[in-house]
């Protein structure tokens, strides 16, 4: 399976939609957009082809479902009936688009040197990222959106599974509600896990649909965490970052792990970006 074959397969599977397609050969992307308002999404075909080797038609089914829901929610309609309980935060990489395809700025905040917080209207099976043009219809200010979203993410269930590897404890939050990574914003939940940790606590959001927390009690644990984050990062439909974060008393510090059985390393470049963010936050306060 190559990108051209995947392009054709997706176009065939999505032929029931009233959409047009635009293929970018250089970037190996396929833009799928509505014919009535030109709103749409762009899919990275090379990433899907890479996953196809392992997941076969399952990954195609996932993409088709995702596109179906996204295109349906992009229909022009009123937002006045949206309730405050539908405002949610979503985590994205700092490289994520800052504006819509129409050039309208999204509502977002910096989070760490590797992550940013965007805000969305929950629509059941999907959600719509909030941009500046939606504020008037929502009758909300940016600050109200921030407060509502944090309140709502704290109300989510934080059920998790655990696994022990070589004496290290790993917690997996994977409810597939679209907000697993968003739970990194629930400081009370993270503090609850921190109180149980006997070693160093690491947190990771490799993609949108998982939050990994680790109680690292020996050197092997760092290697396991590095492997887990990279594996999840490469398989996620909405990847965020392959880096882990050290967590202590409400503070997140991006780290990465070098070499087998080596303790975590603080990357000077990452720290420089993080410090730049901190200075900006302090200035804005």
From Swiss-Prot:
Pfam short name (any one): DUF1444
Signal peptide: none
Family: Belongs to the UPF0354 family.
HAMAP family referenced in this protein's UniProt entry, alphabetically: UPF0354
Full protein name: UPF0354 protein SACOL1793
Phylogenetic classification of the source organism: Bacteria, Bacillati, Bacillota, Bacilli, Bacillales
């Amino acid at each position: 399976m190559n990108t051209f074959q995947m392009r054709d397969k997706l176009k065939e599977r999505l032929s029931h939609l009233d959409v047009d397609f635009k293929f970018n050969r250089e970037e190996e992307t396929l833009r799928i957009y509505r014919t009535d308002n030109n709103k749409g999404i762009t899919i990275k075909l090379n990433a899907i082809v890479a996953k196809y080797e392992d997941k076969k038609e399952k990954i195609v089914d996932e993409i088709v479902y995702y596109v179906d829901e996204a295109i349906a929610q992009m229909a022009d309609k009123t937002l006045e009936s949206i309730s405050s309980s539908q405002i949610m935060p979503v985590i994205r990489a700092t490289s994520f688009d800052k504006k819509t395809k129409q050039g309208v700025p999204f509502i977002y905040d910096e989070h760490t040197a590797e992550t940013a917080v965007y805000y969305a209207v929950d629509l059941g099976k999907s959600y719509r990222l909030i941009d500046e043009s939606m504020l008037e219809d929502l009758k909300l200010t940016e600050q109200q959106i921030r407060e509502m979203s944090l309140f709502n993410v704290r109300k989510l269930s934080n059920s998790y599974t655990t696994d022990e590897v070589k004496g290290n404890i790993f917690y997996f939050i994977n409810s597939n509600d679209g907000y697993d990574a968003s739970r990194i914003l629930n400081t009370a939940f993270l503090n609850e896990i921190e109180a149980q940790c006997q070693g160093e606590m690491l947190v990771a959001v490799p993609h949108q649909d998982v939050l990994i927390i680790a109680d690292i009690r020996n050197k092997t644990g760092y290697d396991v965490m590095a492997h887990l984050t990279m594996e999840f990062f490469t398989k996620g439909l909405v990847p965020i970052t392959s880096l882990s974060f050290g967590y202590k008393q409400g503070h997140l510090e991006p780290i990465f792990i070098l070499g087998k059985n080596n303790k975590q390393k603080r990357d000077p470049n990452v720290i420089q970006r993080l410090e730049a963010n901190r200075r900006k936050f302090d200035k804005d306060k």
